[in-house]
Amino acid sequence: MNSKKRLSLLMIGATVTSLMGGTVSTYAADNTETTEPLTIAEQGIFSAGGITITSDGTFNPEDQWEETGAGQTSHVDYANVLYQIPEEETSLPMVFLHGYGQSRMGWMTTPDGREGWAEMFLRDGHSVYLVDEPRRGEAGQTSVSGTISTKTLDQRWYTQFRIGRWEDGKSVPNEGSQFPNDDNSVDQFFRQMTPDTGMT
């Protein structure tokens, strides 16, 4: 990659980062607990399972933009796993599976910006493995076509996950719930939802 192109990409990245940072940085900073630094010995991402499908025909390297997929393969229906191993591993590893409508993001943080379950277990000496299940999140490649829903379902998620009830346009947490019920936290919770990319 030439230096001019690299500089352009860096400038675009910096612009996007600054725009995104302006929308969330203050909120996250106000809601992060002060804790000791977390030391991770190793971390990475890998994919597991899935299949490889091949389309009939012959791939033509001269025509990169043809849309039939003739003679090409697609790696699909795999899981994607983010793992982190603490510097001092003293307990059994933990595997985190998300629920319906979610991804591993739900284990990584809380709606009000505090450390999530994954970091809590890391601090306690557990290796953590955070799975994005097939056809969801970072494992979105699918062998089964379908229509991604655009239905407006925020309040249903709030109720189905037993956080509370939605009444008169407001979230009402269940008694004893520790869910942070300020407007920003509710907004961040709804932004954790993610669709299936293929029918199951």
How should each PLM-predicted stretch be described?
Residues 2-11:
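Bacterial N-terminal signal peptides that target proteins for export
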Residues 17-26:
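C-terminal segment of classical bacterial N-terminal signal peptides
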Residues 30-89:
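N-terminal cap/lid segment of alpha/beta-hydrolase-fold proteins
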Residues 38, 43-45, 57-67, 144, ...:
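Alpha/beta-hydrolase
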Residues 58, 106-109, 140-143:
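Short, solvent-exposed loop/turn and secondary-structure capping segments
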Residues 91-99:
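Short beta-strand element of the alpha/beta-hydrolase
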Residues 98-110:
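Active-site glycine-rich loops that stabilize anionic/oxyanionic intermediates
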Residues 114-140:
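Conserved alpha/beta-hydrolase
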